[in-house]
């Protein structure tokens, strides 16, 4: 059984301080996109995991954590074989590991017909990682607390297009948060502040990744004719551009946009919404870089 394991974007991310446990409190808007990995689950005589990136075929892979949590909860202990084909870069800030973990939970529930509810899967996901519960939402959601509390967001972002810019070097989440200063916190939580679409972690990450700061400024210059938003997803290192889909209704503007994407080596993707009674399905452009 093959399952699509999609990436996500943080369209904005606001830090509000630290909790009593020392974790950073935040508000973020999540959007699942039609770019991602493929996870295959099959019955086996023993537990195995094969990945096209050998460094991820380890006991530390979150797929194994999902399997253990699923077994503890359901008492289903049959051995399984996983095959993971990665396209999402490591340390990209677009939820690759979290998506794989969530997809593994969904796949196990389908494979063994354990009939766990979506709410149950979401609660299990909270035990794995901050972003994991997102993937049991519709695909558009607001994250609060430490990002793991998911609020439905029905204003589906289908009218926006996104262009991704990956980095050859990822960013560790712990490094991004270790460079946060108190002055980085957003003290306002009203709707206007949230929709400014800033990512407060940019201030932290740019302190030790000047290359990403310079890349963002370069992208802002390239995209300025289209008044597009340029931001960073999560803890980085992925930068992204968003612009209204309606801009492409003008053929000359559409051509200019796609020329800019090609010249800047971006990847054009779309927002993705989960099937009402199933999982996320990949779209036709999954394997195709923007041209």
From Swiss-Prot:
Annotated InterPro entries: GHMP_kinase_C_sf, GHMP_kinase_N_dom, IspE, Ribosomal_Su5_D2-typ_SF, Ribsml_uS5_D2-typ_fold_subgr
Positions annotated to bind ATP: 89-99
Chain segments annotated as coiled-coil in the UniProt record: none
Root EC class: transferase
Pathway(s) it belongs to: Isoprenoid biosynthesis; isopentenyl diphosphate biosynthesis via DXP pathway; isopentenyl diphosphate from 1-deoxy-D-xylulose 5-phosphate: step 3/6
Keyword check for Kinase: yes
MF annotations from Gene Ontology: 4-(cytidine 5'-diphospho)-2-C-methyl-D-erythritol kinase activity; ATP binding
Function summary: Catalyzes the phosphorylation of the position 2 hydroxy group of 4-diphosphocytidyl-2C-methyl-D-erythritol.
Family to which the UniProt record says this protein belongs: Belongs to the GHMP kinase family. IspE subfamily.
Name of the featured protein: 4-diphosphocytidyl-2-C-methyl-D-erythritol kinase
Organism: Chlamydia caviae (strain ATCC VR-813 / DSM 19441 / 03DC25 / GPIC) (Chlamydophila caviae)
């Amino acid at each position: 059984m093959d399952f699509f394991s999609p990436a996500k974007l943080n369209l904005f991310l606001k830090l509000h301080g630290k909790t009593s446990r020392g974790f950073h409190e935040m508000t973020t808007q999540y959007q699942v996109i039609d770019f991602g990995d493929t996870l295959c689950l099959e019955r086996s005589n023993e537990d195995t995991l094969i990945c096209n990136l050998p460094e991820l075929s380890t006991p530390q892979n979150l797929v194994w954590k999902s399997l253990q949590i699923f077994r503890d909860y359901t008492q289903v202990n049959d051995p399984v074989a996983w095959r993971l084909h990665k396209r999402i870069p490591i340390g990209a800030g677009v939820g690759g590991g979290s998506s794989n973990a969530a997809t593994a939970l969904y796949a196990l529930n389908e494979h063994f017909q354990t009939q766990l509810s979506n709410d149950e899967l979401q609660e299990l996901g909270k035990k794995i990682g901050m972003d994991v519960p997102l993937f049991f939402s519709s695909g558009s959601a607001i994250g609060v607390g430490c990002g793991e509390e998911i609020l439905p967001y029905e204003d589906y972002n289908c009218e926006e297009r996104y262009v991704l810019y990956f980095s050859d070097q990822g960013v560790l989440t712990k490094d991004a948060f270790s460079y946060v200063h108190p002055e980085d916190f957003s003290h306002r939580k009203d709707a206007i502040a949230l929709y400014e679409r800033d990512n407060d972690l940019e201030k932290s990450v740019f302190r030790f990744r000047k290359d990403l700061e310079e890349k963002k400024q370069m992208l802002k210059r390239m995209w300025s004719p289209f008044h597009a938003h340029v931001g960073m997803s999560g803890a980085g290192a992925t930068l992204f551009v968003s612009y209204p889909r309606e801009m492409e209704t003008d053929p000359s503007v559409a051509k200019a946009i796609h020329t800019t994407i090609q010249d800047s080596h971006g990847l054009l993707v779309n927002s993705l919404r989960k099937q009402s009674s199933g999982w996320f399905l990949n779209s036709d452009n999954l394997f195709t870089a923007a041209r």
